[in-house]
A protein has these predicted regions:
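C-terminal terminal-subdomain/extension
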Residues: 1-12, 84-155
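Short alpha-helix capping/helix-loop boundary micro-motifs
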Residues: 19-26
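Loop/turn positions that initiate beta-strands
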Residues: 32-33
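Compact nucleic-acid interaction/catalytic patches
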Residues: 44-88
Length: 155
């Protein structure tokens, strides 16, 4: 770890401490399919981190957590099917990075014309399709003779 990484990590720990001592409920409403700023922290490898836009996809049954999908701050315009360039926001939803966070990580809504930005029906359809594709369980093997397909590599 270099000096700058150490400073970034120390700054994130300070921010995380402040987040953990915020009131349990934000002073704004959190709506499904809307875009907010959230603190995702300092993460490992390719995990999305920092203070970045996120799409809230679920906010129940536990009201202290919500499911989010990180959004890039610029459109990626790449060929990955699980990266959806949004119609109403200059960013790309990274469906493969979907996760659950504490609602205290959500900083504030992204507002345009006095309204929290939401996704379009077309965006919703594309994102939904990719969630099903990426996160639905694969069928079990037909017989005990078949072994499950290796997905992750081992050391």
């Amino acid at each position: 770890m270099n000096y700058q990484d150490t400073l970034d990590y120390m700054e994130w720990n300070k921010t995380k401490y402040e987040i953990s001592h915020k009131p349990p409920k934000p002073n704004f409403n959190i709506y499904y399919n809307c875009i907010y700023w959230a603190f995702l922290g300092i993460n490992v490898g390719s995990e999305q981190n920092k203070h970045r836009p996120v799409l809230v996809t679920r906010h129940q049954p536990n009201p202290s957590i919500c499911t989010i999908i990180p959004i890039t701050s610029q459109r990626l315009n790449d060929s990955y099917s699980f990266h959806i360039d949004l119609e109403n926001f200059n960013g790309t939803v990274m469906v493969e990075q979907m996760r659950v966070i504490d609602i205290r990580r959500i900083d504030k809504p992204i507002i345009v014309n006095k309204k929290t930005i939401s996704i379009t029906q077309n965006d919703w359809n594309k994102i939904s399709q990719q969630i099903i594709s990426l996160y639905s369980m694969k069928p079990l093997p037909d017989s005990e003779q078949e072994s499950p397909k290796k997905v992750l590599t081992t050391v």
